[in-house]
Structure formats: C-alpha cells, structure tokens
Amino acid sequence: MVVVLAALAGVLAGVAIYSMNQNDAVKTSINRSEQRRAKLAAEAGIQYALTALQTVADAPQDPVTSDDDWGILGSAGAESFVVGNESFRLQIVDNAARLDLNTITEAQLSNLPLTQEQIDSFLDWREAGQTPRTDGAKDEYYNGLSVPYNTREGRLQTVTELLQIKGWTPDVLYNVQTNTVNSGRTNNNEPVSPIFDLVSLDCYSGAYNPEGNGKTNINQANLTAQQLSQNAQIPIQNATTIINSRNIQPNRQFVRLSQVINLPGIGGNQTVLRSVLDRMTISPAVRVQGLININTATAEVLSVLPGLTEDIANQIVDSRPTDGYKQLSEVLTVSGDMAFLTTAADTLTVTSQSFRVRVVGKAGRTTVSLEAIVTLTNSIPTVIRVEQSNFSNMPERWTWAEESNATTLLENE
C-alpha cells in the first residue's frame, strides 16, 4: 500500500510539474504575442503621425510651432488611440528644437556641462585624422580597450553612439550634470535637463524667403550685385558691398552668413539686416541642417549658442507670438546686440523639416516604446530611423501622464 501511494504521489508530482511547465509555456507564448502586437500598435502610431506631418510637408516654407495641429496631436501622450484590441499613445516634437550632434561646434559644446576631455574626445570621434586633441582620443586609445574598436571619423549614426566615446558615460548622457567644471563656458546657466534631451541628429529646416521661395544664395558664382539687389530687396550699394566682399574671400565663398552682417553699411541698417536674415543663405540647398527653431526650442537649448545670453534666450521664448515667429528678422525686436544677431544669422530659423515621433503601443498588459525620426523629403514625411528604448520608463522620461485621460477609436473615423 505504501508503495502504491508513493508511486501515485510521484505520478501526481510529475503531472503538477508538467502542468506548471505548460502554464509557463502558455504565459511565454502570451507575452510574446502581446509584445509583438504592442510593437505593431506602436508602429501604427508612427504611421498615424505621418498623416499629421503631411500638412507641414505641404507648406515647408511656413513657420513651425508646437501649437500647430501636429504639435497638439495626442495631447503629449495623454490621449489613447484604440485600434482593434490594441492601442497607442503618441507625441510629436520638433527635432529642430535640439542641437544636432553632426553640426554642433566646439564653442557650443563648451556651453554644455561637459569636461574638456569629453569635448575633445567627441570632436576627435567625429573628425577625420589620427592625431588626437590634448584631452581627446583616436584609434590608439580605442584599440587598446578590452573590446577594441575604431574611431568613427564621420557623422554619428545614433545619439547613443556617444557612449562609445572616451569620457562619455550613461550618467553624463542621461542625468542632469550640475558639478561639471569647464573653464571654457561662456554662459553660467544651471543645467536643468540631461544632455540626452538637448541633442539629436538629422535636425533639418527650410531656407525660404517671405514669399515662400528659396532664399538667395549669395555664394552663387554668377550672382551679380544687380540680381542680389533685386532678389534680396536691398539697395544696389549694399548688394555691391556684399558681392565685392564675397569675391575676396577664400574660394570666393562666405563660410558664415554672419560675415555679411559685419560688413560696412549692413549691421547698422535695420532694413538691410532684415533682408540678410530673411532672404539670404550661403548654400544652394533649400534644406539646411543644424539650425535651431526659435518657435519650439527651449531657453536652455538657445542659451547654449555663443552670443545668445540666458536673458535673450528667455526673451525669445517669452515673446513668442501665439502663431509663432513668421520670419527670423523678428528677433530684432528682442535684441539688436551684434553678437546676438551674428549668432541668429548662423544658427537660428523659424521652420523645421525634422520631427521626433514618440509612441507607446499597448497590447494586454504589455507596452512597447518607440521613437522615430521623421524628415520631410520631397514633400513627403519619411521615417529615417526608429529606435526601441532600453528604458522601461520612457513615458516618465518624456514627462507624460502615467495614464491617458482621453480615448479615440480610430476604427470609427
């Protein structure tokens, strides 16, 4: 009898183990299914965002503000869009409100809470050549690591690539840095955001004049003073000054638009200054990389730009018209300081052709967070990169409400 009971107990134990294994297998299958469906829901959210961005693509010359339809879509993650049994929450933000890592200058880097080692190493990573800066690093350093690799020596591909650079740690990138010592800083602002929230890639904007046409490229080889006078709507003598100055530059090219502002008869003339800011460019491209949109950027980002003090940055943000700055020359009402106007000519804009789509897809109890970079290419919103976050708290990092407070059934639209 004892033997029979022991045998029965063994069988029951085996059945229990088998049942537990089966339950685990079912749970795993359900989790995988929910993970897949949540990601599909997030991807659907990205596609939904593209339809909203089409209005910007249809009028790329118009100013871009966060109060536009695309900017209020999803109520900063507070609205849930239901598709079948799944749902997604989303937010679209202007990518041109950030500093572009592939165009950021040493002077701008110096106004971020970074050490000289981090600045030198970043520039060495991005630039060609094998001679490191004093506190930087090239292949000799990276090849000596336990897992060796080479310097990029080119454009960064992702923001998280920063973590491969000497001196750049997760703490530096993701946490607010308040104790960084950098004697090269020209501003004294107290950081309130992590560097990760201030920088990006592929930050594009449009170079259009008030009529919606491409700005006049003052570096165009065959551009005459008469043509510049007509196109930019400035007196012939000012146009002649600009063309003559261009012709004595190295390679007969201006390297910065601000060089024009400092020419005789230009900087002190408000009418001509407006034309320089609104109607001139130094590139043939209608799409420009690395300019900051004053309609969407925070004062913290703006004050990183040399020549743009914290007071002026706050004035730009606080003085924004309800429908945004229409033309860059409107900054003249904020300040006539020449250092600021020099910065404005080289680094600021009122448009954008690049956006970040933040989306959280949900299926069952599972959520998947994605962030897509969308650029306007040939009047079509185009996804150029999608990243799935390794953080479990992305809605919190995006400062979203914990839960949505409104629901939209897309099936009924």
Feature-to-residue mapping (PLM):
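Compositionally biased linear targeting/interaction segments
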Residues: 1-413
